[in-house]
């Protein structure tokens, strides 16, 4: 496309932004042309039979008359940084969702680890959860799992793990913990 435009001496390009379809075209053309990205709200064609050809002609006419307000497109490095930040935010949200699912499994199973540990995903709590998953329905002493810095008494922690986890909840819990650890 860039070669074809260069062949005909085209140095200005105006296009309508629609979804993410404009991005690859913009990335190619920004190196060789002055690209104006127009918001569809401001380039609405007149009423009648609409075709892509008529829309393109309309946008061209608006651009040539100076009636297209260009959208702000940051430089390439900023766009890439924004993309990475969006991805990081999505990963963080996914991690939070998985942690909420773990908490839900524990609550449904009457395992009140959040009452006795400030961090359900800390070392002591995770080791207790792991033991419960490996030995379902088995009564056990929590003492070997507790860190000496644990602020709650052994009796309080023991009472907090006095629940029963179903096979379904255990399977869900294992899967959630696997996702968190990845």
Role assignments for model-derived ranges:
Residues 1-182:
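A detector of single, family-specific signature residues
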């Amino acid at each position: 496309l860039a070669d074809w435009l260069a062949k005909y001496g085209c140095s200005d390009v105006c296009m309508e932004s629609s979804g993410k379809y404009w991005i690859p075209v913009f990335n190619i053309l920004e190196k060789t042309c002055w690209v104006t990205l127009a918001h569809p709200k401001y380039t609405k064609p007149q009423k009648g039979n609409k075709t892509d050809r008529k829309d393109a002609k309309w946008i061209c006419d608006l651009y040539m008359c100076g009636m297209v307000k260009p959208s702000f497109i940051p430089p390439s490095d900023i766009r890439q940084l924004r993309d990475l930040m969006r991805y990081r935010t999505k990963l963080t949200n996914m991690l939070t969702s998985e942690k909420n699912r773990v908490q839900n499994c524990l609550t449904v199973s009457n395992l009140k680890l959040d009452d006795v540990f400030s961090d359900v995903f800390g070392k002591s709590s995770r080791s207790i959860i792991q033991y419960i998953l490996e030995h379902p329905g088995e009564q056990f002493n929590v003492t070997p799992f507790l860190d000496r810095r644990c602020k709650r008494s052994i009796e309080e922690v023991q009472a907090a793990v006095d629940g029963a986890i179903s096979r379904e909840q255990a399977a869900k819990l294992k899967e959630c913990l696997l996702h968190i650890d990845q």
